[in-house]
Amino acid sequence: MNKQWTIIFALIFTLIVAIFAVINVRSVEVDYLFGRSEWPLILVILGSVLMGALIVFSVGIFQVMKLKREIKTLRKENRTAIHKQEDTHLADQTDTQDASAMIEKKD
């Protein structure tokens, strides 16, 4: 359901940007570090939206990679803790069995 809402919001946002871009079709002057040029406002708007989406996508990918690394570390720690717990449990059982065997030998 969450993915459906994401798609719906993305479509609404795309529609709003498209309408806004189509309404603003005149040329505008764009200043670069090395010069100036005239561009249709629709291209400036769409280029800005695409650059913003690229930045958000890059940050999102970085966050996902960071979380995957953290999950891998936590799973490794979890496995280590489980093995230690099993070893402790087996040692306790062995001690109990040894103690029971010693008591039976004394009797």
From Swiss-Prot:
Region (Disordered): 82-107
Top-level lineage group: Bacteria
Location in the cell: Cell membrane
Transmembrane segments: 5-25, 42-62
Statement: the UniProt record of this protein carries the keyword Ribonucleoprotein: no
A GO cellular component entry from the record: plasma membrane
Annotated InterPro entries: LapA_dom
Keywords noted in UniProt: Cell membrane, Membrane, Transmembrane, Transmembrane helix
Compositional bias ranges of the Basic and acidic residues kind: 82-92
Principal subcellular localization: membrane
Topology in the lipid bilayer: Multi-pass membrane protein
Name of the protein this chain belongs to: Uncharacterized protein YrvD
Source taxonomy: Bacteria, Bacillati, Bacillota, Bacilli, Bacillales
